[in-house]
Structures are given as C-alpha cells and as structure tokens.
C-alpha cells in the first residue's frame, strides 16, 4: 500500500444517508489498512503549524528548564528522551504530554483523584497553541465517532455519550536524528485509548501494521496480553508518507474492545530519520469516570473503566515519575475503586 485512503469530513454529522455511507467507508478503510487520512482545511493547517512551531521552540530550551515542566499531580508535562520504555527497551523521543488542564481548585483535584491537576505549561504561547490545536482535533474526533457509530448501524451518539467531557490528551513529540548506532524511535505498540488523530511534519518515520488475516492480536487492555513489541520485526509494516493537508486516524484498544475485534487497534512504531522529526498524537477519549462496554455482546459483563485504564497505563509506562510516586504514597488508587463502583451502578441502573 503506497497511498492511504483520504476522506473529507462533513461540517456536521446528522445521520443522513451520506453520513451512513461515509461511516461504512471509514470502517472498511480501517479493516483493510488499519489507518486512513482526513483532509484538513486552511484553518486546521494553520493551527497544526502553530502547534508544531511551539513544540520546536520548546525543544530548544535547556534540559534543566524542560525537566522542570513536570507535576506530581498529573502526567502532563515533559518526558526526556530515553525515559519512556516499550517492551523493555527505551524509546527516544522528547515528549510533552497535555492532559486535561484542571486548576488546583477543581473539586476532583482537591479530592485527590489520580492524574488530575494543572498542566505545567512552559509558557503562555505554548499553552495557547496546544489548547487551540486540541480543540480543533476534538471537533474532528466527535464527528469521526458519530460516523463510526452510523457505519455500524448504531445510534449516532453511541461513542460520543462516552466522550462527553472526555479525558482527551495529546503527546507532542520530537524525534532526534538517527545515528550510526541508533535508529529506533518508538518500539511497536498499540495505543490504549479510543481514537488517535495524528499530525506530522515532512520528515517521516511512522510505520503502521495493517490487519493481517489469521493473525492473533493481543487485547492490550488485559494485564497478560500486552501488545508492546509484537511483530516489530515481522512484515508487513506500512510507511506513513508525510502528506500536507491531512491528519491520520486509527483505532485504539478501546475501540477494539467495544467492537469485539471488528476494529483492531493499529500497531505502530517509529524509526528515526536523518533529520529531527516533529509530530503530535491526539487521543480522543472517554470521560475519566466512564466505563466502556462490548457493543455487540450485551450480556457480557466485561467493562473497561477509563480512569482506571488510563492510570494503570501511565503508571506502568512511568514507574519512577513523581506522579506515580505520589499516587502510591497517598493511595490515590483508592479513589478509582469508588469511581468504578459508581460507574457500575449507573451502567446497571441499580
């Protein structure tokens, strides 16, 4: 596959025949290729470029300053090259993670919910650029999820009911140039969330694995079935050619779970290039308190409580980060048990 399928989203998804047809086409593209592109307009392109420019400027700052942009309340903030690990091996991008930006006066922050707190922004320009970009990505995310529901002949708000006040977040990445001894950017993995919308510069380095007939894919949300490192050295892998005027879109683990594997979470990896590379990966997510459920097996009792899922994934990824240390020290995971009970009660109506 050399060219990804590219779609233009309607300005509004109403449930009309054209929306249903487009939704089916999106699902078919994911089932065939694992990924597709959506066209962006001039305003979206401007916001993309402003976010990339802010990222480049931040990455030029001294390491001592960048390393100060962390928090023990939230996983938002700076991640140094080599700090993140996939399948036991270090990954090499610099990352700034932007989670939900909540003031210390927010009731959830005051109550000690894990992962809740203000983003440790490096400056106002960076903050404005990233928030503006994420708002634009969020609008696209809502339309994509409505179209996906229609394509499956489900009620239009099946997914967006979960994403109301969603725990949307973004990873802003800089990859260093390759060296004679280093070519790995990020090891093969799937993403833990619902939907991924990504933007990249013109350098290139992203590879995705399309669905392969008969290939068993792990259920990454289960403790014993991590997808990290799977098939990393086994073909086929598709190079995602940098293309102006598009964002790329692929499913995460929660979509695989909710659709019973009709949509597979797309494995992907990054190789370093001869030049530094900048990219943004946006995650359009359920509400922190929401529970995802199997759509086509109504009798199934299995649930993914999003807040627990997110917290577990980040604690696993950053075991030594000050955020993880505080969660453990103050037993903040106890709040998740209470949230899960409330979520289960609402789901069963009891």
Curated annotation (Swiss-Prot):
Residues 166-286 form the Fe2OG dioxygenase domain. Activated by catalase. Inhibited by chelating reagents such as EDTA and Tiron (4,5-dihydroxy-1,3-benzene disulphonic acid), and by DTNB (5,5'-dithio-bis-2-nitrobenzoate) and hydrogen peroxide. Pathway: Alkene biosynthesis; ethylene biosynthesis via 2-oxoglutarate. Pfam families: 2OG-FeII_Oxy (PF03171), DIOX_N (PF14226). Keywords: Dioxygenase, Ethylene biosynthesis, Iron, Metal-binding, Oxidoreductase, Plasmid. GO terms for molecular function: 2-oxoglutarate oxygenase/decarboxylase (ethylene-forming) activity; dioxygenase activity; metal ion binding. Its EC number is 1.13.12.19, 1.14.20.7. Its cofactor is Fe(2+). Optimum temperature is 20-25 degrees Celsius. One of its GO terms (biological process) is ethylene biosynthetic process. It catalyses: 2-oxoglutarate + O2 + 2 H(+) = ethene + 3 CO2 + H2O; L-arginine + 2-oxoglutarate + O2 = guanidine + L-glutamate 5-semialdehyde + succinate + CO2. The keyword Metal-binding applies. Optimum pH is 7.0-7.5. Fe cation binds at residues 189, 268. A dual-circuit mechanism has been proposed in PubMed:1445291 for the complete reaction, in which the binding of L-arginine and 2-oxoglutarate in a Schiff-base structure generates a common intermediate for the two reactions. Simultaneously catalyzes two reactions, namely formation of ethylene and of succinate from 2-oxoglutarate, with a molar ratio of 2:1. Belongs to the iron/ascorbate-dependent oxidoreductase family. Monomer. This is 2-oxoglutarate-dependent ethylene/succinate-forming enzyme. The gene is efe.
């Amino acid at each position: 596959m050399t060219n990804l399928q590219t779609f233009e989203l309607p300005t509004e998804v109403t449930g009309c025949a054209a929306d249903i047809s487009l939704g089916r086409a999106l699902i078919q593209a994911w089932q065939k290729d694992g990924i597709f592109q959506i066209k962006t307009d001039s305003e979206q392109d401007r916001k993309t470029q402003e976010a990339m420019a802010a990222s480049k400027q931040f990455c030029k700052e001294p390491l001592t300053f960048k390393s100060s942009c962390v928090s023990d309340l939230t996983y938002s903030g700076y991640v140094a090259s080599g700090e993140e690990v996939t399948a036991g091996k270090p990954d090499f991008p610099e990352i700034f993670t932007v989670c939900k930006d909540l003031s210390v006066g927010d009731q959830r922050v005051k109550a000690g919910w894990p992962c809740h707190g203000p983003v440790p922004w490096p400056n106002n320009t960076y903050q404005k650029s990233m928030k503006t970009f994420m708002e634009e990505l969020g609008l696209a995310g809502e339309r994509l999820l409505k179209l996906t529901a229609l394509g499956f002949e489900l009620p239009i708000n099946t997914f967006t009911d979960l994403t109301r006040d969603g725990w949307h977040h973004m990873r802003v990445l800089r990859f260093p140039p390759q060296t004679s001894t280093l070519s790995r950017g990020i090891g093969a993995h799937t993403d833990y969330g619902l939907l991924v919308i990504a933007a990249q510069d013109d350098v290139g380095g992203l590879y995705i694995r399309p669905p392969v007939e008969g290939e068993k894919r792990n259920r990454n949300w289960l403790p014993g079935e991590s997808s990290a490192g799977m098939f990393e050295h086994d073909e086929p892998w598709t190079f995602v050619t940098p293309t102006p005027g598009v964002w790329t879109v692929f499913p995460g683990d929660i979509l695989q779970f909710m659709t019973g594997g009709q949509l597979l979470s797309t494995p992907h990896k990054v190789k370093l290039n001869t030049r530094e590379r900048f990219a943004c990966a946006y995650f359009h997510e359920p509400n922190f308190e929401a529970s995802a459920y199997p759509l086509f097996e109504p009798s199934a009792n299995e649930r993914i409580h999003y807040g627990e899922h997110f917290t577990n994934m980040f604690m696993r990824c950053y075991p030594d980060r000050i955020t993880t240390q505080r969660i453990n020290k103050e037993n903040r995971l106890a709040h998740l048990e209470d949230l899960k009970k409330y979520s289960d009660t609402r789901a069963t109506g009891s």
